[in-house]
Amino acid sequence: MPRTHAIEDYRNFGIMAHIDAGKTTTTERILYYTGKSHKIGEVHEGAATMDWMAQEQERGITITSAATTCFWRDKRLNIIDTPGHVDFTIEVERSLRVLDGAVCVLDGNQGVEPQTETVWRQADKYDVPRVVFVNKMDKIGADFFKCVADIIDRVAGKPVCLQLPIGAESSFQGVIDLIKMKAIVWSGEALGANFDETEIPADLKDQAVEYRTKLVEACVELDDDAMSAYLDGNEPDEATMRTLVRKAVQLRAFHPVLCGSAFKNKGVQPLLDAVVDYLPSPADRGEIKGIDFKTEEETVRHPSDSDPFSMLAFKIMDDPHVGTITFCRVYSGKVETGANVLNSSRDKKERVGRMLLMHANNREDIKEAFAGDIVALAGLKDTRTGDTLCDPQKAVILEKMEFPEPVIEIAVEPKSKADQEKLGIALSKLAAEDPSFRVSTDQESGQTILKGMGELHLDIKVDILRRTYKVDANIGQPQVAYREKLTRRQEIDYTHKKQTGGTGQFARVKFVVEPNEPGAGFSFESKIVGGAVPKEYIPGVEKGLNSVLGAGVLAGFPVVDVKVELVDGAYHDVDSSALAFEIASRAAFREALQKGGSVLLEPVMKVEVVSPEEYTGSVIGDLNARRGQIQGQDMRGNANVINAMVPLANMFGYVNQLRSFSQGRANFTMQFDHYEEVPRGEADKVIAKYA
């Protein structure tokens, strides 16, 4: 089947926002108007088409980004729905990596919220062009102009209005289109298919002219001909305006702002027009950089079917009907079912079995995919999130994604032998789907440890274990992922000798052990000259060091940011072995950590509390009691926003405490910021508990 749409007619975009800004509802309406779903799913009824995991339908939040294809004005839209909850920012990072543009949805009443800032910064990192949709204009307290001001104040954006609202709250009727200078009014609530273009209401005429002038001035800045015509008194016509706004979005010169109410079916069609008119196609985004698999030189792939095939796997899901499905974006070339491709990130061969085009929860089998497509592949064996699949003859590795380290962990104990087996299978699948979720086994207790980005993140994983995989298990209390770090440079000379008749054991090692830069991790270097320790024993030395890294000397937590140099040693022709050097290295490293003033590090979270003013005193007092350091506060609407750095150890159960003293009116978000040393008194308690 040949290509149905030219690559210039593709729009790969995501919808990003804070939790509850109405992102999934907006997506639902888009799917409705583009003719894909005949009954609109409402999030608060737990029936939204994009939220298809049971956990999402119950909690009314979107956890996994489902990719969906639909059509508008004969353009092909691939929408990726992204979660807005802070524990799932990894999902957002993944989807932004493969998007060409984004729609940022704001809650008309709340403006730019903490998670909007996080997502906006992530979009800046990947240089994603975006338009802004101010949603919920029908809500009490909705304030379009405050939202526009927020974009400047809170995320340093450059908003330029393409629309103004007509009325607000319950009297919100429609929008003024500043390019056409017409009012668009929706009649009734009936799925908003009927709207009329009329003249701008007299009372809004002056405001419309003022904002139209701002829009025109922002546009003509981008084009010398348009600028000189404008200075001669000629405003650009409609087509020129659209071309200039499109150029502005591509260059990120400004962010166009639209408004509406997705729930009340107002403003969605003009938003779709804006996606088509202003967001870039894969061709506009241009070439993508990569590393040549053989030469390791930098190379590029162009978004065209004639270039060698390359695609990036950005999401893995376990589907009850199809098995493992891998969502991929094709960057160049084309691929057919049955093709043999190379996973260049892991140097493994893969075969393309089934290829699916996804609508939120139903799927269509396709035979080939082209540059710009977002498809799901069933049955890949070795591919993980962030891997590149490509033409084996012209192999390339597209840039890697970076994934944050988990900061919170819980122990899981299966209740029976049968559960033990099911748990193993389930956890390996969950870890493959989500790189920010790690699984390990505690060597001493034999418990299985799950690590994640926050309490909600782990809650949902446990829920999936129980429901989807039917694993019955006891779940421990959440624990903080402490770390240990050396503070002083040490030189250690250690000899391991064991003589028990027959072959003995002998190994001598001399190490220089010193603290590494924060975040630099562990590094080992052998500076042996003249064969004082033969090459074949060096792996034994490394194995010994690695065994200590997993469990430090203070309380058995992983050791971070340490640099070890092997500077000297000695061996015996008969009695030395890799095992002897492993034992010597382990003992020497432990001694260095004991003498080198090891300290305990803890994760510190960046916390933002949004609270009505009357509770500010209680919030600050409570954060101080949790060893928090207040970074600052400001007003947002009539609420007070308090920013603080608080150790994760003191944040467990905070959500319930905050709800109780603010009668449920305050809320907070937190995300990992950095590790820092635990104060002496606290450290002693932790060591006593775990050692």
UniProtKB/Swiss-Prot annotation:
The keyword GTP-binding applies. One of its GO terms (cellular component) is cytoplasm. It comes from the Bacteria. SUPFAM superfamilies: EF-G C-terminal domain-like, P-loop containing nucleoside triphosphate hydrolases, Ribosomal protein S5 domain 2-like, Translation proteins. One of its GO terms (molecular function) is GTP binding. PROSITE patterns: G_TR_1 (PS00301), G_TR_2 (PS51722). NCBIfam families: EF-G, PRK12740.1-3, PRK12740.1-5, small_GTP. This is Elongation factor G. The lineage of its organism: Bacteria, Pseudomonadati, Pseudomonadota, Alphaproteobacteria, Hyphomicrobiales.
